[in-house]
């Protein structure tokens, strides 16, 4: 798997169990509803080990910049803060979010390809959401 496969614009086309995931990680009702109604586009750029990911939607735009394998401070769109590390393992991009506050919940976000689709799973505890994107 080449990191270059991820480069481009990706439009959300399928979403399963996303609201349950957001509830599990502690996102409030109004923000959950808004996030579930949004149909985000991902813009991914890669330069060596440095990645730049924009998530664009009518709900909120976010930017995530990171270097593979290097821990960084991350603030989620709803304001939760994590120590995060993103690596490539077995052809998948694995994003581990470790909570800073005891009231937050750790998550693992994994991205890989199934045919032409970019699949993303978001897991916290026993709750797993699956989302699929297609290239624009």
UniProtKB/Swiss-Prot annotation:
A fatty acid binds at residues 111, 131-133. The lineage of its organism: Eukaryota, Metazoa, Ecdysozoa, Nematoda, Chromadorea. The keyword Transport applies. This is Fatty acid-binding protein homolog 5. InterPro entries: Calycin, Fatty_acid-bd, ILBP, Lipocln_cytosolic_FA-bd_dom. One of its GO terms (molecular function) is fatty acid binding. It holds the Pfam family Lipocalin. It comes from Caenorhabditis elegans. Belongs to the calycin superfamily. Fatty-acid binding protein (FABP) family. One of its GO terms (cellular component) is nucleus. One of its GO terms (biological process) is fatty acid transport. Keywords: Lipid-binding, Transport.
């Amino acid at each position: 798997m080449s990191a270059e496969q991820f480069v481009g614009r990706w439009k959300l086309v399928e979403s399963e169990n996303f609201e349950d995931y957001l509830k599990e990680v502690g996102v409030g009702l109004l923000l959950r509803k808004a996030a579930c109604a949004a149909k985000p586009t991902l813009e991914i750029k890669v330069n060596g080990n440095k990645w730049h990911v924009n998530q664009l939607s009518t709900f909120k735009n976010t930017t995530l910049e990171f270097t593979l394998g290097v821990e960084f401070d991350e603030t989620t769109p709803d304001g939760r803060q994590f120590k995060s590390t993103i690596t490539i393992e077995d052809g998948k991009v694995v994003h581990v979010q470790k909570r800073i506050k005891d009231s937050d919940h750790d998550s693992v976000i994994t991205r890989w390809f199934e045919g032409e689709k970019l699949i993303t799973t978001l897991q916290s505890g026993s709750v797993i959401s699956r989302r699929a994107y297609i290239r624009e």
